Amino acid sequence: MRVRASVLDLGKKLPKRGDPNNAEFTDDAKTDAADDGLVVLASYGTTPKGRGPRGTAEIEDLVLDVGDDYLRHPALNAAGLSGTEWLALFRANIAVESAFNPDARSSVGAIGLGQLMPGTADLLGVDPHDPEDNLHGSARYLLAQLEDFGAADLALAAYNAGPEAVRDYGGIPPYAETEGHVAKVLRLTNATLSSE
């Protein structure tokens, strides 16, 4: 089943859970998207060495399982996102952050699937080196930004550049990395939600 929606339509009234027009992110939908090449990103030849799942498909399943744990989070209502949109957004953020590589490390020290900074991981009470823990921290941090800013683009900017930067600029900061991050995540989210 395909979903026609855009996280850019945040003010639009969305169908409720159980409505036949609101496709759940089922195994069939995941398979369809994977068949279309919309949700498969390579880890560029790296072999995950961390604890937990080893392959990209297993990591993607873990991403969706963790995302499922937060389907009833109040931040989704605050940002006007359905569960399907949340799962697509969360998955896309992880894809862009780490290409599903649990051992990814940035030049500034961000760690793992969600590219959590050590201080952020400490505040969230998660082990950034553990794939599942890292994903829970990433989900909670992204949800906090959705709750604070009420929009997917601003939440992604805050996830990438920090909430202070978004507040200081009154929107997406004019940093090339942050603007690129937001654009890539939203593009992948919308590709996942759209049929081709």
What is the predicted role of each segment?
Residues 137, 157-196:
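Catalytic and substrate-binding regions of cell-wall glycan-acting enzymes that process beta-1,4-linked
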Residues 92-99, 119, 161:
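Glycine-rich, acidic and aromatic/proline-enriched surface loops and short helix-turn segments
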Residues 45-54, 77-80, 103-107, 120-131, ...:
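Second-shell loop/turn segments in exported
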Residues 1-95, 187-196:
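Cell-wall glycan-active module
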